């Protein structure tokens, strides 16, 4: 992004665009969000941007984060967390501008000034699901990533599939289970699952990072898997197991009227052993539990088709900024869309930036491009 382009969108009184990096949140993916933020805060160009790190504690409190968050990492014994503070951050309208205010008991509130763009690195409910996007829309604040509707659809695995099917994209067999349905007639649910055929995957409808997901091979394990998923969400999606390779594709919004850009597809391979599928530990905790091959070893026509379908999925939900689209590639060459993630993991080791790196766009450049897209996107209905 050129200096002229940056200055065009910089609030009066700012030498460079002010970027509020928002992370943490109330969801069970709080720690993952913190690690994502650590990656971005470690790579963003501080010569180009005035960066304000804002954490959301699990209580919902917004705090100004100090210290070296770039060292945060995930391990079996270490889950980073935003700590509540007496000094809270709010977004308030002052002099016709929406500004960040730091307030604490018995102190005069401190004005941090206007924000040019918010980079919400929030995963899961109350952040990735349209809630924070709605707040930012109400305050007429530009932000990175998908808008309210696309974020909400991308968070709900049930309605995501409804939208994909309406757009002519092939999804696998599944059922959606509401809280009321399970509580009032669990036997009917067991029969519906039996018709899907085992194995099945039981998932919280509105959770990510493989939280609460179980593979179930028979009726005997179904109720326990449902109970585990319901700890994360009372609405569930139960999917028939699909034999196929796990293929992913990164999507980046096009500039202006250009179509979405797609990376070379990558393939996830889970190492043989204790992980039956790509679960939370394989994703984030154990370095050798899974590997990414990019570009995936696929025929040229399959690679082209993955990229075409990934862009179609991006457009189907009305996404903006970035998304990662996941597929199954079956032995007979079918591509079945699994899901779209409108705020994918964004550490330097995450699949989304790795696929772009393999496609010629580095991590710092990717951050620049996302901020550029947000600064140049109009607010309000679009």
UniProtKB/Swiss-Prot annotation:
Binds 2 magnesium or manganese ions per subunit. The keyword Ion transport does not apply. The keyword Protein biosynthesis does not apply. Its EC number is 6.3.2.4. Residues 161-372 form the ATP-grasp domain. It holds the Pfam family Dala_Dala_lig_N. Mg(2+) 1 binds at residues 326, 339. One of its GO terms (cellular component) is cytosol. GO terms for molecular function: ATP binding; D-alanine-D-alanine ligase activity; metal ion binding. GO terms for biological process: cell wall organization; peptidoglycan biosynthetic process; regulation of cell shape. InterPro entries: ATP-grasp, ATP_grasp_subdomain_1, D-Ala_lig_Van_CS, D_ala_D_ala, Dala_Dala_lig_C, Dala_Dala_lig_N, PreATP-grasp_dom_sf. Its cofactor is Mg(2+); Mn(2+). ATP binds at residues 193-248. Belongs to the D-alanine--D-alanine ligase family. Cell wall formation. This is D-alanine--D-alanine ligase. It comes from Arthrobacter sp. (strain FB24).
